């Protein structure tokens, strides 16, 4: 979580995304949304990990800061979710990389959070296999983000129980980590910006 503060202090030195390519590939995708080549180009241009994602789509109150990417976050993330031609394993790995190290926050991180949940419901077997291949600490980081809720409800609880019941035999250790994350982060966090303000 401390990384978020560091990035907020000076994102330029960390930004590795070609935003011109990202924006141009998004515009091309809008013209041909079913094109597998346009989908792949946009997918490849999209941030590959949480650090780059945060630096690309973050909000900054500093005078003169260009908020065009912040404003484009929702449309870009929805477009990413619509890239159905991308190999499922590749797509799930990308969502895992975007989630590991992430903190719940308004706008872009919240949109990402929703996309990861939607894809988990559609491709849980692939998600779980990909997660089982990464280090246990990074598994915990994924579940931390995935299960973070400021105020959770019955739907979240039923989703957790369903996933846990479905995979506890195949991935017992990972389901233990998932349960720990649920206990601590579901109804147990604030948006990270609110947390910093409350210190």
Protein language model regions, located:
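Compositionally biased, intrinsically disordered low-complexity segments
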Residues: 4-10, 80, 148, 153
């Amino acid at each position: 979580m401390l990384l978020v503060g560091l990035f907020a202090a000076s994102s330029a030195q960390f930004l590795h995304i070609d935003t011109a390519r990202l924006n141009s590939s998004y515009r091309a995708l809008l013209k041909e949304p079913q094109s597998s080549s346009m989908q792949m180009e946009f997918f490849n241009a999209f941030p590959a990990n949480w650090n780059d994602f945060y630096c690309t789509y973050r909000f900054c109150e500093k005078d003169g800061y260009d908020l065009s990417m912040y404003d484009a976050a929702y449309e870009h993330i929805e477009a990413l979710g619509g890239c159905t031609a991308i190999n499922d394993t590749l797509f799930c790995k990308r969502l895992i990389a975007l989630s590991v190290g992430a903190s719940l926050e308004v706008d872009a991180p919240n949109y990402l959070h929703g996309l990861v949940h939607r894809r988990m419901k559609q491709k849980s077997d692939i998600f779980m296999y990909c997660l089982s291949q990464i280090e246990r600490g990074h598994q915990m980081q994924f579940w931390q983000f995935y299960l973070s809720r400021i105020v959770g409800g019955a739907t979240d609880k039923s989703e957790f129980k369903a996933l846990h019941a479905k995979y506890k035999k195949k991935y017992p250790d990972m389901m233990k980590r998932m349960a720990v994350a649920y206990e601590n982060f579901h109804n147990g966090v604030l948006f990270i910006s609110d947390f910093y303000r409350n210190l």
